[in-house]
């Protein structure tokens, strides 16, 4: 009688796929109350107040488009449209603030001085009330973060599907 050999079941290596960390976070907005009148905005003694308000907004919302920052700042003084006079005041204020600036197409984005656009890896789809920003108000660094999240969730997408899935994030 021959020897009986029992076969061992093959052992396969398994790889556990860990879910990618969610890069989405709420878009925090600065709660801005009216500060003064349009006439007061242009007074030299108002510059430190404008600067403080700009820093407050940047601390909550950076990266933020220059247009959105300007709109919030002048709105605090009841000004609805920017012009040469407001641009001059704000140019002086912006020179005094510790910030970084990136340009996407024709849109400038202001970052806190301590934020590094090269390592920024989150995206902010909406604020706590569900309000969403226009595409022109979202820096490319946030869009890139959303794209990398989509690619980690779904490998092998066509370009059209990647664009659609990324757009759903916002």
Label the predicted regions.
Residues 1-170:
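C-terminal non-catalytic scaffold/interaction domains in large multidomain proteins
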């Amino acid at each position: 009688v021959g020897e009986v050999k029992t076969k061992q079941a093959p052992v396969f290596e398994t790889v556990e796929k860990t879910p990618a960390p969610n890069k989405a976070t709420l878009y925090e907005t600065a709660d801005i109350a009216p500060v003064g009148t349009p006439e007061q905005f242009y007074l030299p003694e108002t510059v430190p107040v404008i600067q403080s308000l700009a820093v407050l907004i940047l601390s909550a919302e950076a990266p933020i488009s220059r247009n959105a920052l300007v709109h919030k700042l002048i709105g605090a003084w009841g000004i609805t449209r920017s012009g040469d006079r407001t641009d001059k005041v704000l140019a002086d204020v912006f020179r005094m603030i510790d910030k970084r600036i990136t340009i996407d197409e024709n849109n400038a984005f202001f970052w806190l001085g301590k934020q590094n656009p090269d390592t920024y890896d989150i995206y902010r789809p909406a604020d706590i009330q569900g309000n969403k920003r226009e595409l022109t108000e979202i820096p490319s660094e946030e869009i890139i973060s959303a794209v990398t999240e989509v690619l980690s969730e779904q490998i092998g997408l066509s370009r059209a599907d990647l664009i659609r899935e990324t757009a759903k994030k916002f």
